[in-house]
């Protein structure tokens, strides 16, 4: 994992974690205005940048974040935000409770099981897309339909990092589709904001699962949109929603 920082170090410290097999730089292009108000830390997940080792697990990614925050930020963050798989990783970070996080925003978190079959189908589709320069195959379209995604939701594929190895892709997909909630999350005192679109059935199922454990949370369902649509197509409104939370 690599870490990239921008903004005034005297401002609130906000960590922004990208989605599965995505390019942190493309997420920064959308989220960059936040750097005017916050000291922003963008991790690049293992396997998702040139010269990286292969991705192994969510726990490894959490350990990298914990080590960085402990060594560079006195073990504390004012807020963390994660999209899709980034949000899922942050649920594990919360459960581990090894650094202090005041506020957590989970957008499109996926914890409802889709299983190894979905991971296998996804791997085939990702490898084909990688070979075809990122074009969305029919297999991937079918996988996305199983996830409740529609055509506008597929814009998030433009944020992908296509240099990932087959090993990293496989490990990512297996983790993403088989990860189970770490029940230690019930001990966290962090304020958690659950976000998703009204057309995200798996994310909404995941919210229901998390509510059984979280002590302190709010829920925001964006009307008539799917996975990643608010960030990608309604960026200004989306950033304002983040600013309203992280004051």
What is the role of each PLM region?
Residues 5-50:
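Conserved HGGG/HGGXW glycine-rich cap/lid loop of the alpha/beta-hydrolase fold
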Residues 41-79:
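Active-site loop/oxyanion-hole signature of alpha/beta-hydrolase fold enzymes
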Residues 95-96, 101-132:
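Flexible "cap/lid" loop of the alpha/beta hydrolase fold
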Residues 115-117, 133-186:
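Conserved alpha/beta-hydrolase catalytic His-Asp/Glu region
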Residues 225-236:
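Catalytic histidine-centered segment of alpha/beta-hydrolase-like enzymes
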């Amino acid at each position: 994992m690599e870490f990239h920082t921008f903004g005034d170090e005297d401002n609130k410290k906000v960590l922004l974690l990208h989605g599965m097999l995505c390019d942190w730089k493309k997420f920064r292009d959308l989220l960059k205005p936040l750097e005017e108000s916050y000291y922003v830390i963008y991790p690049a997940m293992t396997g998702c940048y040139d010269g990286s080792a292969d991705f192994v697990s969510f726990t490894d990614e959490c350990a990298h974040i914990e080590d960085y925050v402990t060594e560079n930020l006195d073990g504390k963050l004012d807020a963390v935000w994660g999209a899709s798989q980034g949000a899922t990783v942050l649920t594990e970070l919360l459960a581990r409770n090894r650094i202090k996080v005041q506020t957590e925003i989970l957008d499109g978190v996926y914890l409802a099981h889709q299983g190894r079959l979905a991971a296998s189908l996804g791997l085939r589709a990702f490898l084909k897309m990688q070979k075809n320069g990122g074009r969305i195959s029919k297999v991937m379209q079918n996988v996305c339909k199983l996830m409740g995604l529609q055509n506008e939701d597929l814009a998030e594929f433009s944020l992908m990092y296509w240099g990932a190895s087959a090993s990293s892709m496989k490990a990512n997909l297996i983790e993403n589709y088989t990860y189970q909630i770490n029940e230690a999350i019930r001990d966290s005192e962090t304020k958690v904001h659950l976000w998703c679109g009204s057309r995200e059935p798996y994310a909404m199922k995941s919210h229901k699962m998390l509510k059984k454990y979280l002590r302190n949370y709010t829920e925001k369902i964006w009307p008539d949109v799917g996975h990643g649509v608010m960030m990608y197509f309604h960026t200004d409104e989306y950033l304002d929603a983040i600013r309203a939370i992280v004051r």
